[in-house]
Design a protein with these regions (language model features):
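Alpha-helical interface subdomain recognition
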Residues: 1-83, 90, 103-108, 115-120, ...
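Short Ser/Thr-interspersed hydrophobic loop/turn segments at strand-loop and sheet-helix junctions
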Residues: 50, 73-78, 172-175, 182-187, ...
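A short, Trp-centered hydrophobic/proline-enriched beta-strand micro-motif
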Residues: 119-127
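A short core secondary-structure module
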Residues: 149, 153-193
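Long, acidic (Asp/Glu-rich), low-complexity accessory segments flanking structured domains
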Residues: 212-230
Length: 316
């Protein structure tokens, strides 16, 4: 039966992603978790395959495909069950690259977006602070303009890709309000501390301190004081990517469950023969199917329109 949302090309793309993940991700997940780091070589391969530039214009090295390719990609990331790896990719593409693509100058796009699409530079987004969480109004990190530079002071915490990434899209307070700066991780005065975690260890999570970090004014994303608006627009894509990854993760968990209850025996037969478990599995599968249709519909509409706050918020 023909899909309402996907074409044959989308299906072929899904098949190629599955094959790539089976060859390049699944065999290495345990090692990455043990090492607390995703091998950069796989990220570079993903860049070479065009996976980081699905919705990026061709002039910046992307392939500029419709939004359903984006949806398919993040659903399949979730289905890998490699949630640390998935966090690295989502943080790079959706949290960091997306802001540069939407609000960056031509200079910033050439300097950061192009190598990000190629997988040779990996980005992070820094919003959360130690005493404010993600409460943007309570943000304490500041950027004071002095001539052709901003002087940045403050700290961020729980930043995905914050330790091993190459640049950090940072939200901070300027004289005119909340602004966004692209800051190189190797900048003088910037230090990162990797946090130890119980799970999802292959995704590096960091505390970041800014001590009189000097950032060129040219690294400002969009207009000074307009950062909140940029974040509200970009958060829609972030939430949708997170929801699609979660749906893929649910399918992964359901597949594991089906395999387990087919093998596990009790009272002389596989436990998948017990009606109470069959009902529960059917209920879970129905919930997943309903959420998928809702998210596919939201993705399809978001690809046609610029703002769908209500639908995207419901997806979370």
């Amino acid at each position: 039966m023909k899909s309402l949302f996907f074409t044959e090309e989308h299906d072929l793309f899904r098949k190629s992603i599955k094959e790539f993940f089976a060859a390049e991700v699944h065999p290495h997940v345990d090692k990455w978790e043990k090492d607390s780091k995703v091998d950069r070589s796989v990220l570079k391969k993903m860049g070479e395959m065009g996976y980081f530039g699905l919705n990026v214009p061709e002039k910046y090295g992307g392939v500029d495909l419709d939004f359903m390719y984006f949806t398919t990609f993040y659903e399949e990331i979730g289905r890998t069950g490699a949630f640390g790896f998935g966090t690295v990719v989502v943080s790079h593409v959706v949290l960091a690259m997306n802001y540069i693509m939407k609000a960056g100058s031509e200079e910033l796009k050439q300097k950061y977006l192009v190598p990000s699409v190629q997988g040779t530079k990996i980005g992070a987004l820094a919003l959360t602070e130690p005493f404010a969480g993600s409460d943007l109004k309570g943000m304490k990190t500041t950027a004071v303009r002095e001539g052709d530079h901003y002087i940045v002071n403050g700290s961020k915490t729980f930043i995905s890709n914050g330790h091993y990434g190459d640049y950090i899209v940072t939200a901070l307070k300027t004289e005119t309000g909340i602004s966004l700066l692209v800051i190189d991780r190797e900048s003088e005065g910037l230090t990162t501390s990797k946090l130890d975690k119980v799970g999802i260890r292959s995704s590096d999570t960091a505390e970041i301190a800014f001590d009189n970090v000097k950032v060129p004014v040219s690294h400002l994303l969009g207009q000074e004081g307009k950062g909140f608006g940029y974040m509200m627009e970009s958060l829609q894509v972030e939430r949708l990517a997170g929801a699609m990854t979660a749906i893929g993760g649910m399918e992964y968990a359901l597949d594991l469950t089906l395999n387990y209850i087919a093998e596990r025996e009790a009272f002389g037969r596989p436990i998948n023969k017990f009606q109470v478990l069959r009902h529960k599995v059917a209920e879970m599968a129905s919930d997943i199917a309903a959420w998928k249709i809702f998210l596919y519909h939201t993705s399809y509409r978001l690809g046609k329109e610029s703002l769908l706050s209500r639908n995207v918020l419901c997806s979370n």
